[in-house]
Amino acid sequence: MTPVLVINSGSSSFKYQLIDVETERSLASGLVERIGEATGVATHTVFFHGEDAAVAATKATSSRELPIPDHTAGFAVMLEAFGEHGPSLDDARPVAVGHRVVQGGARFFEPTLITSLVEINIDELSALAPLHNPGALQGIRAARAAFAQVPHVAVFDTAFHQTMPAAAFTYAIDRETAERHRIRKYGFHGTSHKFVSEAAAAHLDRPLSSLKQIVLHLGNGASATAVHGGASVDTSMGLTPLEGLVMGTRSGDIDASVLGVLARRDEMTPGELDAFLNTRSGLRGLAGASDMRDIERRRAEGDPHATLAFDVYIHRLRAYIGSYLAQLGGADVIVFTAGVGENSAGVRAAALETFGFAGIHLDAARNESPGRGIRVISTDESPVTVLVVPTDEELEIARQAYTVAAR
């Protein structure tokens, strides 16, 4: 057994998962939330695996409410949960701790062993990700105190996209201003895009280095990435996760002049504009609901707002698919992943129905058929293979953390 603890920390909560990287099975997972509030909540789940890997694990979940004043207290609660409910960290002591960090800027292009200097650099990059990096740093500091003798590794969402050429990541604004404020496209969901593109190549038994892939990570947050030979060459998210596709609550691409209009006419502050575009836009802004399942249900019932929201979502998605087909000079593989991508046959069908000219042909029965794991949903004759690949960012973080720790 080679356990790696994966931490995904925010400002008021953190998720954790203990993964055996030998078997790639989850041993336990949990969520500590409402940190700093009067009453916090800690949930811990233990997984029990049999000899047959094909048989789903059974699990036992426990939950408790108690004051959790800060992340250090939260980690103490997590350790108590392992001690009380298992697995015992004496028997399954982590060989490494992997931390998800959203923004690594141009500085971090690979998973990195965390030192005091790395902590300082992550803190400095908080200017580019004020909603994410500070919470990650709180988790890192608490985890390093709780597991002082274990290597800690930062895995950056942005790292996978550091292979983009300058033409893809450069914004056409004043160069000196852009350099001074580090304004450029960084991209996000990189850990997922890396995991999924590699899993697709392995499933097809084709060399990753030979494939042109378009990976569509469609969840509440959504991004598209053009992957050539295993490297990101373009991606839809930009300086922040706001740019690109229509999302659950984010607008995606928008004329920047809209911000000036709202600032002048509604006297909105920069913070209010950020909140407007990130939390009150996207599907929620168009139809009052951020969940694609609700949008599709209401669309089927004839709701005009849900219908328009779905149509705008698909229009934007097709635009990016078409753009990346042009950037790559065609594609070998298109991959759908994350909550919407893995579960909405309607979104997948609508997104690809106009791309027959590019050799993309869905098999309707395969697309509609529910299934677990990786599955092909294109026809046998389709020149471009279309796959559904469940993402597993925690497993990818565990793999990368173990690789760095074992050096």
Language model segments and positions:
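Short glycine-rich, Thr/Ser-proximal phosphate-binding strand/loop in the N-terminal lobe
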Residues: V4, S13-I68, G238
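Glycine-rich beta-strand-to-loop/alpha-helix junction loops that act as flexible
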Residues: S9-G10, H99-Q103, L218-N220, A331, ...
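Phosphate/pyrophosphate-binding loops at sites that engage ATP/ADP/AMP, CoA/4′-phosphopantetheine
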Residues: A81-V95, A200-P207, Y320-D332
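Short beta-strand-loop/turn "lid" adjacent to the catalytic site in phosphate-handling enzymes
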Residues: F82-H132, P151-V153, A159-T170
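Glycine-rich phosphate-binding loop of actin/hexokinase-like ATP-binding domains
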Residues: F160-R265
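Catalytic phosphate/nucleotide-handling subdomain of diverse soluble enzymes
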Residues: V227-T269, A275, A338-S369, R375
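A mobile "lid/hinge" subdomain adjacent to the ATP/sugar-phosphate binding pocket shared
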Residues: R265-A309
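Internal helix-turn-beta structural module
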Residues: T307, D311-G329, V335, G341-R407
